[in-house]
């Protein structure tokens, strides 16, 4: 194929119609170098300002030399280039996260709204097969998205309909580590795919066909369920269990960076079936909020997180707060659940310390400031310590000390339990 053929495809698809500035992820491999050539040659026709971004993973001797060559290439093309060096223990996942964090920084700095990557059809086949082997959810078997909006940016993969063999042989850097089978993707590319193609020479086309079919089903379900308010639990639960699962999965497609595992999805389902109000951190900065017959998934707000001064928890309710799950009168299962005797007669307040706070110990009121000094509690831990209060008295300083009322008084007043579980944030 000739370069104008790729240009015509880009124009027909309208990839850059909404964008004035685009960042190209430039690895130096054949696919990204050819994409660089097409985009830099036809900037005017595509009406974009091109910005280059490269990550030096520091995993090969040649990587520093390649970085210098890419700087020269950018200078010759009179294009800006941003480069970052990966450090720390290397893994595919850590490197990928590092790259995308860096690309977003570049976009924020330059005002670009599109990130362009050179993923092609061969990458798509490998990705779908990897996910299938790992046992991912069906909707993820549609593979890499051609266009994907994440927050305020759009990721564009204009080569996704082309195979690597469609690209002309031009100057590029060959990563010799791609021939090693140390990483899963390399084993897919070098070992598994060739063996499967012996059974079916059109295996790659078959995998791509399955991915496209799953994508069609996803889009059709989204369109057909457009008038269903999934966040209304009364409406959601009016359908069969199977339909509920599909509707909930379709709803989760609204949050492309959430990516719940099967176990996490099952946990969300269980929470939605609970009768109590609920606030639960899920993953990647999202939380699930359930209030009676309504729920929503949203980014954790500062008010609901570390900056909240005081939280009020009512009987038969649960709430996630600053890395803990508090359950008032509703038992939690697990080996590391803390239990604090409390009363069901009034709400519980969870907060940080205040000037003048006291705790009753051995029948005596002791100021928290003196207690912290006696226990040699570091200042940082003093400031972050969570205070559990009821009836205007401190019941517990989480993980540090508890109000030790007499047994008779405790039995008379404390007629239920506050369950506390440490959770990941």
From Swiss-Prot:
GO biological process, one term: tRNA modification
InterPro entries, A to Z: Lysidine-tRNA-synth_C, Rossmann-like_a/b/a_fold, TilS/TtcA_N, tRNA_Ile_lys_synt, tRNA_Ile_lys_synt_N
GO molecular function list: ATP binding; tRNA(Ile)-lysidine synthase activity
GO cellular component: cytoplasm
Alphabetized UniProt keyword annotations: ATP-binding, Cytoplasm, Ligase, Nucleotide-binding, tRNA processing
Keyword ATP-binding set for record: yes
Pfam families per the UniProt record, alphabetical: ATP_bind_3 (PF01171), TilS_C (PF11734)
CDD domains linked: TilS_N (cd01992)
Lineage top rank: taxon: Bacteria
Binding site for ATP: 27-32
Similarity comment: Belongs to the tRNA(Ile)-lysidine synthase family.
UniProt free text on domains: The N-terminal region contains the highly conserved SGGXDS motif, predicted to be a P-loop motif involved in ATP binding.
Name of the protein in its database record: tRNA(Ile)-lysidine synthase
Biological source species: Streptococcus pneumoniae (strain JJA)
Taxonomic classification: Bacteria, Bacillati, Bacillota, Bacilli, Lactobacillales
Encoding gene, per UniProt annotation: tilS
């Amino acid at each position: 194929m000739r370069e104008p053929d790729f240009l015509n495809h880009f124009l027909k698809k309208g990839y850059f119609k909404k964008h004035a500035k685009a960042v190209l992820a430039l690895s130096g491999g054949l696919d990204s170098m050819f994409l660089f050539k097409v985009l830099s040659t036809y900037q005017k026709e595509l009406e974009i300002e091109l910005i280059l971004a490269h990550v030096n993973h520091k995993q090969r001797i040649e990587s520093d030399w390649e970085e210098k060559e890419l700087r020269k290439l950018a200078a010759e093309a009179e294009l800006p280039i941003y480069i970052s060096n990966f450090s720390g223990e290397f893994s595919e996942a850590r490197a990928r996260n590092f790259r995308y964090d860096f690309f977003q920084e570049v976009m924020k700095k330059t005002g670009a709204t599109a990130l362009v990557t050179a993923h092609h059809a061969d990458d798509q086949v490998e990705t779908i097969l990897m996910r299938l082997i790992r046992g991912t959810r069906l909707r993820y078997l549609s593979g890499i998205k051609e266009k994907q909006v994440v927050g305020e940016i759009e990721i564009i993969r204009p080569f996704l309909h082309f195979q690597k063999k469609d690209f002309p042989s031009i100057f590029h850097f060959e990563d010799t580590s791609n021939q090693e089978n140390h990483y899963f993707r390399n084993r897919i590319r070098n070992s598994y795919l060739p063996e499967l193609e012996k059974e079916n020479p059109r295996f790659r086309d078959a995998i791509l066909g399955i991915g496209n079919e799953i994508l069609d089903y996803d889009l059709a379900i989204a369109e057909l369920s457009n008038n269903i308010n999934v966040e209304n639990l009364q409406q959601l639960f009016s359908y069969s269990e199977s339909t509920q699962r599909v509707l909930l999965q379709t709803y989760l497609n609204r949050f492309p960076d959430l990516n719940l595992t099967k176990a996490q999805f099952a946990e969300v389902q269980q929470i939605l079936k609970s009768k109590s109000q609920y606030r639960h951190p899920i993953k990647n900065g999202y939380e699930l909020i359930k209030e009676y017959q309504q729920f929503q998934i949203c980014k954790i707000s500062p008010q609901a997180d570390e900056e909240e001064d005081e939280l009020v928890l009512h009987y038969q309710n649960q709430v996630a707060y600053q890395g803990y799950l508090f359950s008032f009168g509703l038992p939690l299962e697990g080996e590391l659940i803390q239990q604090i005797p409390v009363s069901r007669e009034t709400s519980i307040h969870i907060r940080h310390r205040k000037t003048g706070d006291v705790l009753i110990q051995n029948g005596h009121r002791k100021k928290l400031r003196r207690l912290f000094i006696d226990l040699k509690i570091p200042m940082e831990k003093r400031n972050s310590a969570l205070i559990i209060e009821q009836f205007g008295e401190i019941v517990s300083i989480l993980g540090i000390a508890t109000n030790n009322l007499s047994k008779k008084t405790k039995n008379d007043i404390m007629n239920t339990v506050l369950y506390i579980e440490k959770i990941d944030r």
